[in-house]
Swiss-Prot record:
Name the record gives this protein: MIP18 family protein YHR122W
Xref: InterPro entries: FSCA_dom_sf, MIP18, MIP18-like
Source organism phylogeny: Eukaryota, Fungi, Dikarya, Ascomycota, Saccharomycotina
Native source organism of the sequence: Saccharomyces cerevisiae (strain ATCC 204508 / S288c) (Baker's yeast)
Stated family: Belongs to the MIP18 family.
Matches recorded under SUPFAM superfamilies: Fe-S cluster assembly (FSCA) domain-like
Pfam name, any one: FeS_assembly_P
């Protein structure tokens, strides 16, 4: 039986790592406007002329700015013309505005850990495909009073990788420092990627062992160096 190698042995460049490309492209096209019609016009223009400096696109920008100007409503000093809001209505209205839940998704978790440096190679875990976006699961309702969970499956470059535990520890430290306390973090080796898969999994998810490892100054120093490259 041939030895397992990382499913994606090709080293990725930083600009090849998964990002929220669609959102950033849309923001670039809109250029500060929230008008969907503007987005459509610019998209069509960029298919003809890919230069953001084109004269046609600049003319459209000027037109958009003119169209965005609104004539202010006529001011009035007649306060009696406004319906008075009762105390009951003001109290009831106060509860209508609810903050949208701040959800944390797989992309956000990936952004936190992809730039961790590999302890052996001068590359990041994302570049080596040790961590992959599709191997991250997040269960988060957004409710600050409910527990949430992050499950990450890492892929060592070789089946006998002696640094798999250290890499997992680096990921755990990074997430524990970045995420709210309500998140439960589970780090696993991807099935079939390591000779000591079960043993390493137990070490990475044993609270007492992790706490003891973090008290080791030498080990913590190595982890800190791994996290220096995080963005």
């Amino acid at each position: 039986m041939s030895e397992f190698l990382n499913e994606n042995p090709d080293i990725l460049e930083e600009n090849q790592l998964p990002t929220r490309k669609e959102d950033s492209t849309k923001d670039l096209l809109l250029g500060g406007f929230s008008n969907e019609a503007t987005l459509e016009r610019r998209s069509l223009l960029l298919k003809i002329d890919h230069s953001l400096k084109s004269q046609v696109l600049q003319d459209i920008e000027v037109l958009d700015k003119l169209l965005s100007i609104r004539i202010p409503p006529e001011l009035t000093s007649d306060e009696d013309s406004l319906p008075a809001e009762s105390e009951d209505e003001s109290v009831a209205g106060g509860g209508k505005e609810e903050e949208e839940p701040d959800l944390i998704d797989a992309q956000e978790i990936y952004d936190l850990i992809a730039h961790i440096s590999d302890p052996e190679h001068p590359l990041s875990l994302g570049q080596l495909s040790v961590v992959n976006l599709e191997d991250i699961d997040v269960h988060d309702s957004g409710n600050q009073n409910e527990m949430a969970e992050v499950v990450i499956k890492i892929t060592p470059t070789i089946t006998h990788c002696s640094l798999a535990t250290l890499i997992g520890l680096g990921i755990r430290v990074r997430l524990e420092r970045s995420l709210p306390p309500r998140f439960r973090i589970t780090i696993l080796l991807k099935k079939g990627t390591h000779d000591s898969e079960n043993q390493v999994n137990k070490q990475l998810n044993d609270k007492e062992r992790v706490a003891a490892a973090c008290e080791n100054e030498q080990l913590l120093g190595v982890v800190s160096k791994m996290l220096v490259t995080c963005k």
